[in-house]
Curated annotation (Swiss-Prot):
Organism of this sequence: Helicobacter pylori (strain P12)
GO process terms (BP): cysteinyl-tRNA aminoacylation
A molecular function GO annotation: ATP binding
Gene name of the encoded protein: cysS
E.C. code: 6.1.1.16
Lineage of producing organism: Bacteria, Pseudomonadati, Campylobacterota, Epsilonproteobacteria, Campylobacterales
Name this protein carries in UniProt: Cysteine--tRNA ligase
GO cellular component entries: cytosol
Length: 465
């Protein structure tokens, strides 16, 4: 298994701290609003990593957190007259619903920052004791980055260029020094009683503490195999996580760092600050979650994905092929490449080379359909074909529905009954040799984007996009 390590900037063999086991920490959302397609892409990218590792024989523990203590949450909670717990729980539920719709496997653990305050305080106390942190007059505590000679080694931000000394009035020693603890400022603030005084943790210390508390190993209590997240988290978040871990415990936080690329809208980076966010829940109003998943995984995870609906509909054709084969196999049988599982898994073991994997998938779909055309009654390889289709489900998380359910997405039960009534009416017209009426019914349904197909088993239908 090979993965691209952001820190070394090269593709390297994956060699976990414990043989045949992999522990992964993925930075989750700050829960003050609904999740957008950028969140979806990150979740799907590392869901693919998890699935690939599991099918390669690794025992995987994947942790994805919720940041439920943050300035944005506090500000919105006060504006809406809610507690931060009330507000964050709304968006945790929303995020969970969205990812379920995208068939993202549930993480092994989903810690909330608010559940690990004691661990955060202990880590800050360690940094103060070792003289890597300092407190300013308003009670805030900062990490002294000048004492970490490796600061910037992950993101390649050069402190001498990117930052400068600032006025003594502001009390921070360097502009890049980051807050570990924010003291309670009174009205419209949130604080927790602690040995550090009343206050709350900074964003970066939250994640590091949750990493150690949820993924600690006996032989490496302060290091994990893979730390992952979106490219926007590389600096300052991941850089600062790595820094405070080196300072507190003298080790690198993660053996490997992985980052997924941005999602662009109209060739511009999607972000809430730019006002061009495309929420998952809104996308799900127009497209089934499996169609969105199939589209978002279709571009290599490290590349930028420029979202547009034309490409989404083109990528849907791949899903159509999977379901057409599944539909055929459930009724008729044929042969398939016996090396398919090995070939597609090897593609994914090469830094999640999904483009190559999808090429192998396309080849399998085409060749299998050809063999079904040649041997429509051959039952010998039914189990193998269905096993390979199941493997696609497990590896890529697509093709999981019953074919009829997939091809009838977006049609209500009452509409389905109307269509079935029309099909029955058309059947009677054909029996009475009234082919003009039968064709008229077909055209009427087609005008409503319902296509009919006559098969040996009877007439089936599907919704066109």
């Amino acid at each position: 298994m090979f993965i691209y390590d952001t820190k070394s900037k090269q593709k390297v063999p994956f060699e976990p701290l414990v043989q045949n086991k992999a522990n992964i920490y993925v930075c989750g959302p700050t829960v003050y609003d609904d999740a957008h397609l950028g969140h979806a892409r990150s979740a799907i990218a590392f869901d693919l990593l998890r699935r690939t590792l599991e099918l390669s024989g690794y025992e995987v523990v994947l942790v994805r957190n919720f940041t439920d203590i943050d300035d944005k949450i506090i500000n919105k909670a006060f504006k809406e007259n809610k507690s931060i717990q009330e507000l964050s729980s709304i968006y945790i539920e929303s995020y969970t619903r969205d990812l379920n719709a995208l068939n993202v496997k549930k993480p092994s653990l989903e810690p909330k920052a608010s559940e690990y305050l004691d661990a955060m305080v202990r880590m800050i106390e360690t940094l103060l004791e070792k003289n890597f942190a300092y407190q300013v007059s308003n009670g805030d505590i900062y990490l002294d980055t000048s004492k970490d000679k490796d600061y910037g080694s992950l993101s390649m931000h050069n402190s001498s260029v990117e930052f400068s000394r600032i006025g003594l009035v502001q009390e921070k020693r360097l502009e890049q020094d980051f807050v570990l603890w924010k003291s309670y400022k009174g009205d419209n603030d949130v604080g927790f009683d602690s040995p550090l005084g009343k206050g709350r943790p900074g964003w970066h210390i939250e994640c590091s503490s949750m990493v150690f508390e949820t993924l600690a190993l006996a032989n490496a209590p302060y290091q994990i195999d893979i730390h992952a997240g979106g490219a926007d988290l590389l600096f300052p978040h991941h850089e600062n996580e790595a820094c405070q871990t080196r300072c507190a415990f003298g080790v690198e936080l993660a053996k490997y760092w992985m980052h997924n690329g941005f999602v662009n809208i109209n060739n511009e980076k999607m972000s809430k600050s730019l006002g061009n966010s495309f929420f998952i829940k809104d996308a799900l109003k127009n497209y089934d979650g499996e169609i969105l998943r199939n589209y978002l995984l279709g571009v290599h995870y490290r590349s930028v994905l420029n979202f547009n609906e034309e490409d989404l509909l083109v990528s849907k054709k791949r899903l159509d092929k999977i379901y057409r084969l599944k539909q055929r196999v459930l009724g008729t049988l044929g042969g398939i490449n016996p090396n398919f599982k090995k070939e597609i898994l090897e593609c994914m073991q090469d830094d999640l080379n999904v483009s190559k994997a999808l090429s192998v998938l396309e080849s399998m779909l085409s060749s299998t359909n050809e063999k079904l055309d040649q041997n429509p009654k051959n039952k010998a390889l039914k189990g193998e074909i269905l096993a390979n289709l199941k493997f696609i489900e497990e590896l890529l998380g697509i093709g999981v529905k019953d074919p009829s359910a997939y091809f009838q997405l977006g049609v209500s039960e009452s509409e389905k009954q109307e269509i079935e009534n029309k099909i029955e009416e058309r059947k009677r017209a054909k029996e009475q040799k009234d082919f003009l009426k039968a064709d008229s019914i077909r055209e009427e349904l087609l005008n409503h984007k319902i296509a009919l197909m006559d098969t040996p088993q009877g007439t089936i239908w599907e919704k066109l996009f």
